[in-house]
């Protein structure tokens, strides 16, 4: 029987008035306790996650402990934690959405032994707040009362420890109830977890940081920054148009002086601004940090500044102070922060000399973040000297108006500076990637496929699915060595003479139930993360590399889209969607499929499925397969031509493919040939994605997950147009169609790299393609600019993209004949889907950044130990693709590197080239025009560098103790190093990349072995960062089609 109570809430309006609101509050005789000791599990309805039965006690943190020590409670060693609803609501109301979401994710994580107890809805636990009672006292009293009830509910069989920071509560409740202990959190760690050193260090760091924060607030100092405006003033100002809301983006090359606010939401439509807002200097930034959602006030036009066009080396000073900036742009100052983007930051402690300069007895240390865009952070620690050579993680606690720098606390050690594992861990933390091995609870949900217990198609599925095993020739075309085959194709002639085209995708959703442990984990990861030498799978390998991989000769579940096409025009007559059973006949690799398409049948000997066939049967099978590949290619040509007529773009993408041996070791790197079968497979996938998008939108117009690609801002094309003009080309950017036609015609027969670079610039100008919920967007905004399609989604890679899993469920619900209620209930509402899309978009950006950063790490490690003065491989050909006021940007086709080459050095000397092209530094000046830059010495000698000139470049590494190492480019001659873009150069470049990986990996292994021999190996907690270990830098390119040209939908972030 429910009991009704009234709950009084005091809410503050935008105008500052306080409103008293009374709401109904219902109490229940039972709520889920989630304990295995529950005497009445049916009554409590303990259907979800249960506490471990192996713990010696349960621990209940009060509201203050949850607020201040949540990161300690995240340690997996701490088990049997019961979070009371009262404490969770305190976090939500007092610490904001970010920490509250962190707590929610902790509760959902199957790896952490913690549960939520809704004490405020349990009639015996709920205590009304007494008149005049402080909120904090009521919260503590309510949590203690709930702890006592929980102890008795479990029939006094499990001691309960309530941890609190309230000394009065410890004195009052410490010995009140036998079996319920009330102690401080510090005492709890000392008594129950004395050997958990990392937790003690983190707890001490938090306590020290809190004490200093409290002491600083009592001291009076001169203000370094103005106060932020109250929330109600900010919201009113945004509504009236006086203030502008946006996301702060700090320029990593000028982190101290230059940041931009990208307009967000209504601000972008109402302000009338077409460009970002410049925030010049740290004072105008007013304690906001890169990624914060800020509120900006525009300065008068007389105070507007321009962005600097000079190259800069990520130093704290303004290196371009003597350079002329670009034309003034809207400039403003931050007046408030709506949402902080504080996260874990990887930092480096100062060297001994720097520590001494801060004071001998100073416990407050300024640490330097790995990310240039983050300001130095002041932390308190006595371990500064011991941790000088390590990368460590810190968190920001506060940033007062009286402090130049934010205050934070030490969290944990990652690894030694320069050590491969430490640097990889740094990349993961910096991109908020926290991927640990799948838990036991998650793996228990997985199917079994062993020699003793092989997986088989179930009779029930045979009845409900369309069986294609004996009626369709199904085959896959993938890179060599690919194991996670998530798509296959088929084509056949129907009885009426028309054709049937089929795209068959692994049926991941059959094995991943909605809201199961593995589904929640996959949703959290959102994507498979591919780093340079390893990957972190979204799903366990039993699915990604086995039961959901459409391998040849085995039965597999699939979700298929099949079209009936006109036999001559290939116009689509009708389409069928559904679940199928397939048995792929051939697992082809691209080169073999292309050889068959070209009529070179000697490649048959390399196709395993043909080796065991008799000659007569072999010839018949070969003719059948060749016909299918040819027909698929012909269909794909027609589909592509139709999209081309609508303005589909072909932009610059990845151009390398790895060739692996049977043991998955790297064998060779070969040039990425523009094979037609790449386009064939890509067009079939795009077609499937397009038709599935139309289907799920028709069925769920307000809650379908689609992918939009907005038209880019025209101002982003300015550099592309200027560069093309330098070569005599005109780029029309008014639409995707005119842009595509212009790029196709911008070819220099003497230098193919020109078109390659122009397409690369067009890629840089593109907006990001994003997932969205159709209920949150007008239909005219659904359009995909790059693919020239009115509706598009991702359906074809559910093994490595959670978005595709959502789309599969939408499609299944859309075609369900009986419209089962449970199918619909598992779909996301528009609001929840939009939130999920934001999460997936964020995780996709993190995946892209981490992959790029890890590749750059290996490049630097390769060149770091080479002498650039004597090593032949360090001198290469480069092509200039952009002019700056003090240098040029250069592309190195041999290694695929882009970077800055200075024409004026730190001493103010300019580059001078002799008759043979060799360079040296002399006093002089630089004169820049639109498509060239002239270096003139004091003696009157001059050298001119034009856009698209080929120059000889020396590659070296600029080491950094606090940040990542960087590739440094230096022009050593204004003459080409060799004939530009020859096949020999291109091929040798790929071979060198192979050597890069091997040498870096070998060097790391040798260094680790040497450390072990000396007995000086320092134990580092980095195993949590390693999951699926790769064998080479480019193994990932073999395993993920998203990064290769064959998946046109993703080659330019579509």
Curated annotation (Swiss-Prot):
Domain (CSD2): residue spans on this chain: 365-431
Cofactor requirements of the protein: Mg(2+)
Principal localisation: cytoplasm
Residue numbers bearing the Phosphoserine modification: 989
Any one GO molecular-function label of the UniProt entry: exoribonuclease II activity
An example Gene Ontology CC term for this record: ciliary basal body
RNB domain residues: 465-816
Chain positions covered by the region annotation Disordered: 313-332
EC number: 3.1.13.1
Domain of life: Eukaryota
InterPro entries attached to this UniProt entry: Dis3_CSD2, NA-bd_OB-fold, RNase_II/R, RNase_II/R_CS, RNR_Ribonuclease, Rrp44_CSD1, RRP44_S1
Signal peptide: none
Pfam families in alphabetical order: OB_Dis3, RNB, Rrp44_CSD1, Rrp44_S1
Record localization: Cytoplasm
One example of a Gene Ontology biological process annotation: rRNA catabolic process
Domain CSD1, first and last residues per copy: 236-313
Catalyzed reactions: Exonucleolytic cleavage in the 3'- to 5'-direction to yield nucleoside 5'-phosphates
UniProt keyword list: Cytoplasm, Exonuclease, Exosome, Hydrolase, Magnesium, Nuclease, Phosphoprotein, RNA-binding
Catalytic EC class: hydrolase
Function in brief: Catalytic component of the RNA exosome complex which has 3'->5' exoribonuclease activity and participates in a multitude of cellular RNA processing and degradation events. In the cytoplasm, the RNA exosome complex is involved in general mRNA turnover and specifically degrades inherently unstable mRNAs containing AU-rich elements (AREs) within their 3' untranslated regions, and in RNA surveillance pathways, preventing translation of aberrant mRNAs. It seems to be involved in degradation of histone mRNA.
Binding partners and assembly: Component of the RNA exosome complex. The catalytically inactive RNA exosome core (Exo-9) complex is believed to associate with catalytic subunits EXOSC10, and DIS3 or DIS3L in cytoplasmic- and nuclear-specific RNA exosome complex forms.
Record family assignment: Belongs to the RNR ribonuclease family.
Name of the protein in question: DIS3-like exonuclease 1
Species whose genome carries this gene: Rattus norvegicus
Lineage, highest ranks first: Eukaryota, Metazoa, Chordata, Craniata, Vertebrata
Protein encoded by which gene: Dis3l
